[in-house]
């Protein structure tokens, strides 16, 4: 903070000092600034990701002030760290200056972006709020005023303003010395009080005068610190009523309700406006009659209240204090102009100041005594407030264009690169058009990242930034980055970059899916998002083939157990697994004895040793379960087909035209194979189409034809159903049974059992109804009894099925 209040510059950013001690300090400062730079880069990256993925999005395409507030906090931490750099080092001074400026840039932008939201609630009743919300130029100047007050406040309190305020709060009156003198007994002329007086217009004792001067100085600093109300209360408590009243008048200009939108006698708006106008005119006459006493503490205070620019500029020893001088006067002028109680000519005479933020900052930038660092601050704020992003890009490139990573003799401080790289990146992420200057800065930033992280291309951001993270944070941060990617193309690019950077992509992908599963338990992630994230495993090749198939099975189980069941999503998941040839990849992994990763939560690590029995067991079960779940879909399709042709009740959702087009329509395909699981869907689709046509024509197909077709379907589906019932991949008592290390498969086993209980009773009941309708109960009886009551169902469902059969007069014992 202190550097921004200095009037000169003593840094050169060079290491040409011949003095060994100075060189050692510069070396140390460079070393520690590199650490600050690395940590700052990581934090800024997180904020940029949050911005890019919409965390800071608010209506009307704006960015939440929260982003700038968080950046202010980050920069403040770095600024505090730079204060600990070795004193007397040029690089220390340079680092602290840039850290200071980063704090102030974030501060003014956080204030500016928040103003419209803060004043929105009173915009219908307050002129001040209306100006803030609807007049963007007023909002910019007001932001400069509030920012400069905040910065001055921090600086003044560091210098002991708080102690001075507390001292005044402990004094009963500004005439305390007169009071004490008048209380003393007087026994002679020599002891009589000379200048003691309780009259506020009388000079009072020298001690009184010194106390009042100190109070005026404190009030002045409180005004510039944005604490006029505190100054007013303090003045009144000290018995300085006249000053207190004027301070109260000034403080009212910050209260939206004290500046009503519509002036009337009811809200005293007319009186307030006219008297405020007269007050400023009267005060100006008094200042003119003071005959050059502007340096007096009282007149300095009055000039601050009045917005008299020249004394305030003279009192301003730093750029921020001069910003306050201009902004204070400009805000007063704009408010008085909006109130309309004073002519524009009178306002121009009273407040001969620039009335736009750009003109104010241009005025300050034109002063020759400003240092390069302060010039950077003013120009960046000017560009950002006025959306002159092209100039920001140009200036950024001019300032950091010569940066060389890891070069202690580089004339560009690495913290300057952090500031401009992030400002340009934020502008890009906010929708501003890139240009050559902006791109040059982005490339410089990525060159720096590559120099510290090694191998990866700057186009693959995640790989670069992961190099800066502590080892224990690397995997979680990569996983969070992977979560934010929402397109298949981006996933493949990022996956390739992670692999090229020697990062264990398979472990990252498995960790991501583990977190998604946990999020699923707490209902904070949608099914669609889970399917999208599953793509990370699908593109991992043989290494993640087992994990991909396990996650595929979990997603299918999840949809099967949802209410209502979305059959199309189940088919979508299976198609995706087959499109990426997951079963084939898994078979190749076994043949190649490749290391595979598993998500089965049995207490083992992700990585499975090639050829180990546990790995083989997991692969076999995942494959059997996958084909078992596909069999549920196939059998269900045939059951729906049979129900439609026999007019039996069976719950289903019609196939959409889009999905029908995806599978090639309802016609039989010449190249259909035994492994074509879509064949059953086309059979069902033809049945649905036939039913719709019959409804439209109001004519059913000939009975014998229909019976013959159903019989063909039964001949096909019964072997499939037998295989499904006996498939140990969907029999929970096999691979999913409790183990020596506990019962890690309990949830998985429960889901499989629930699926069996849900689907198999429906299948057997429909088959029984079909057997009765076809008068073929004998064959059905043989089929059912061949299972010896071992359908892998809970006992209650076996009882339910047999009870239903009894109602149909089917004997199955």
Swiss-Prot record:
<keyword id="KW-0498">Mitosis</keyword>
<keyword id="KW-0159">Chromosome partition</keyword>
<dbReference type="GO" id="GO:0000776">
    <property type="term" value="C:kinetochore"/>
</dbReference>
<keyword id="KW-0132">Cell division</keyword>
<keyword id="KW-0158">Chromosome</keyword>
<comment type="similarity">
    <text>Belongs to the nucleoporin Nup84/Nup107 family.</text>
</comment>
<keyword id="KW-0137">Centromere</keyword>
<dbReference type="GO" id="GO:0017056">
    <property type="term" value="F:structural constituent of nuclear pore"/>
</dbReference>
<comment type="function">
    <text>Involved in kinetochore assembly and chromosome segregation during embryonic mitosis. Required for the localization of the NDC80 complex member him-10, the chromosomal passenger complex component air-2 and nuclear pore complex proteins npp-23 and npp-15 to kinetochores during metaphase. Required for npp-23 localization to the nuclear envelope during interphase. Recruits mdf-1, a component of the spindle assembly checkpoint, to the nuclear envelope. Appears dispensable for the assembly of the nuclear pore complex and for nuclear protein import.</text>
</comment>
<keyword id="KW-0653">Protein transport</keyword>
<dbReference type="GO" id="GO:0034501">
    <property type="term" value="P:protein localization to kinetochore"/>
</dbReference>
<dbReference type="GO" id="GO:0006606">
    <property type="term" value="P:protein import into nucleus"/>
</dbReference>
<dbReference type="Pfam" id="PF04121">
    <property type="entry name" value="Nup84_Nup100"/>
</dbReference>
<keyword id="KW-0906">Nuclear pore complex</keyword>
<dbReference type="InterPro" id="IPR007252">
    <property type="entry name" value="Nup84/Nup107"/>
</dbReference>
<dbReference type="GO" id="GO:0097298">
    <property type="term" value="P:regulation of nucleus size"/>
</dbReference>
<keyword id="KW-0995">Kinetochore</keyword>
<dbReference type="GO" id="GO:0005643">
    <property type="term" value="C:nuclear pore"/>
</dbReference>
<comment type="subunit">
    <text>Part of the nuclear pore complex (NPC). May interact with mdf-1.</text>
</comment>
<dbReference type="GO" id="GO:0002119">
    <property type="term" value="P:nematode larval development"/>
</dbReference>
<dbReference type="GO" id="GO:0031965">
    <property type="term" value="C:nuclear membrane"/>
</dbReference>
<keyword id="KW-0813">Transport</keyword>
<dbReference type="GO" id="GO:0008104">
    <property type="term" value="P:protein localization"/>
</dbReference>
<keyword id="KW-0472">Membrane</keyword>
<keyword id="KW-0509">mRNA transport</keyword>
<dbReference type="GO" id="GO:0031080">
    <property type="term" value="C:nuclear pore outer ring"/>
</dbReference>
<keyword id="KW-0131">Cell cycle</keyword>
<dbReference type="GO" id="GO:1900037">
    <property type="term" value="P:regulation of cellular response to hypoxia"/>
</dbReference>
<protein>
    <recommendedName>
        <fullName>Nuclear pore complex protein 5</fullName>
    </recommendedName>
</protein>
<dbReference type="GO" id="GO:0010965">
    <property type="term" value="P:regulation of mitotic sister chromatid separation"/>
</dbReference>
<dbReference type="GO" id="GO:0006406">
    <property type="term" value="P:mRNA export from nucleus"/>
</dbReference>
<keyword id="KW-0539">Nucleus</keyword>
<dbReference type="GO" id="GO:0051382">
    <property type="term" value="P:kinetochore assembly"/>
</dbReference>
<dbReference type="GO" id="GO:0051301">
    <property type="term" value="P:cell division"/>
</dbReference>
<dbReference type="GO" id="GO:0000973">
    <property type="term" value="P:post-transcriptional tethering of RNA polymerase II gene DNA at nuclear periphery"/>
</dbReference>
<dbReference type="GO" id="GO:0007059">
    <property type="term" value="P:chromosome segregation"/>
</dbReference>
<keyword id="KW-0811">Translocation</keyword>
């Amino acid at each position: 903070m202190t550097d921004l209040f200095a009037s000169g510059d003593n840094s050169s950013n060079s290491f040409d000092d011949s003095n060994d001690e100075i060189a050692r300090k510069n070396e140390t400062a460079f070393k520690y600034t590199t650490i600050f730079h690395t940590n700052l880069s990581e934090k800024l990256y997180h904020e940029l990701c949050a911005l890019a993925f919409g965390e800071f999005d608010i209506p009307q395409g704006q960015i939440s002030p929260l982003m700038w507030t968080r950046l202010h906090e980050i920069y403040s931490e770095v600024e505090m760290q730079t204060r600990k750099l070795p004193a007397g080092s040029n690089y220390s001074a340079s680092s602290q200056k840039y850290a200071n400026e980063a704090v102030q840039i974030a501060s003014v932008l956080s204030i500016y972006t928040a103003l419209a939201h803060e004043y929105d609630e009173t915009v219908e009743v307050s002129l001040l709020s209306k100006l803030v919300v609807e007049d963007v130029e007023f909002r910019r100047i007001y932001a400069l005023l509030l920012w400069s007050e905040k910065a001055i406040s921090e600086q003044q309190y560091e210098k002991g303003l708080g102690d001075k305020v507390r001292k005044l709060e402990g004094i009963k009156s500004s005439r305390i010395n007169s009071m004490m003198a008048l209380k003393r007994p007087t026994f002679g002329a020599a002891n009589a009080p000379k200048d003691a007086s309780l009259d506020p217009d009388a000079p009072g004792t020298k001690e009184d005068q010194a106390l009042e001067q100190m109070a005026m100085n404190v009030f002045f600093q409180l005004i510039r610190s944005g604490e006029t109300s505190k100054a007013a209360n303090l003045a009144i408590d000290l018995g300085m009523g006249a000053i207190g009243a004027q301070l109260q008048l000034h403080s009212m200009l910050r209260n939206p309700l004290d500046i009503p939108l519509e002036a009337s006698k009811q809200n005293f708006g007319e009186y307030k406006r006219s008297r405020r106008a007269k007050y400023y005119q009267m005060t100006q006459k008094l200042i003119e009659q003071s005959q050059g006493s502007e340096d007096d503490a009282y007149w300095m205070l009055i000039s601050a209240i009045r917005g008299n620019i020249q004394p305030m500029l003279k009192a301003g020893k730093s750029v921020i204090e001069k910003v306050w001088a201009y902004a204070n006067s400009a805000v007063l002028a704009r408010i008085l102009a909006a109130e309309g109680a004073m002519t524009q000519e009178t306002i121009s005479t009273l407040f001969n100041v620039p009335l736009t933020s750009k003109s104010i900052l241009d005025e300050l930038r034109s002063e020759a005594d400003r240092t390069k660092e302060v010039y950077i601050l003013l120009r960046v704020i000017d560009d950002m407030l006025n959306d002159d992003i092209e100039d920001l890009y140009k200036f950024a490139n001019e300032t950091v264009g010569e940066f060389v990573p890891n070069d202690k003799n580089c004339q560009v401080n690495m913290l300057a690169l952090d500031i401009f790289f992030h400002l340009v990146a934020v502008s890009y992420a906010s929708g501003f058009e890139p240009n050559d200057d902006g791109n040059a800065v982005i490339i410089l930033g990525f060159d720096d990242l590559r120099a510290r992280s090694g191998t990866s291309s700057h186009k693959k951001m995640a790989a670069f930034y992961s190099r800066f993270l502590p080892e224990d944070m690397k995997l979680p941060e990569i996983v969070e980055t992977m979560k934010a990617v929402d397109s298949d193309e981006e996933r493949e690019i990022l996956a390739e970059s992670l692999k090229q950077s020697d990062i264990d992509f398979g472990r990252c992908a498995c960790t991501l899916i583990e977190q998604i599963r946990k999020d699923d338990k707490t209902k904070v992630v949608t099914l669609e998002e889970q399917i999208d994230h599953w793509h990370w495993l699908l593109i991992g090749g043989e290494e993640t083939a087992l994990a991909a198939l396990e996650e595929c099975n979990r997603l299918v189980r999840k949809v099967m157990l949802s209410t209502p069941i979305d059959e199309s999503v189940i088919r979508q998941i299976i198609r995706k697994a087959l499109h990426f040839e997951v079963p084939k990849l898994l078979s190749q992994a076994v043949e190649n004895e490749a290391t595979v990763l598993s998500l089965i939560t049995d207490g083992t690590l992700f990585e499975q040793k090639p050829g180990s029995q546990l790995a083989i067991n997991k692969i076999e079960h995942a494959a059997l379960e996958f084909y078992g779940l596909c069999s549920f879909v196939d059998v269900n399709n045939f059951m729906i087909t049979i129900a439609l042709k026999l007019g039996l009740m069976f719950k289903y959702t019609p196939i959409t035209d889009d999905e029908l087009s995806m599978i090639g329509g309802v016609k039989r395909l010449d190249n259909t194979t035994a492994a074509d699981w879509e064949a059953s869907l086309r059979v069902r689709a033809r049945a649905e189409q036939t039913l719709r046509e019959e409804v439209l024509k109001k004519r059913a197909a000939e009975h014998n034809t229909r019976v013959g077709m159903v019989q063909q379907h039964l001949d096909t589906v019964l072997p499939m159903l037998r295989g499904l019932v006996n498939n140990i991949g969907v029999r929970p008592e096999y691979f999913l049974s409790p183990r020596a290390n506990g019962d890690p498969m309990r949830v998985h086993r429960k889901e499989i059992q629930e699926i069996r209980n849900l689907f198999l009773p429906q299948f057997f009941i429909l088959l029984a109804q079909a057997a009765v309708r076809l008068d073929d109960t004998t064959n059905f009886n043989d089929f059912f009894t061949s299972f010896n009551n071992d359908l892998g169902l809970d006992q209650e469902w076996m009882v339910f099925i047999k009870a239903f059969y009894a109602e149909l007069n089917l004997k199955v014992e």
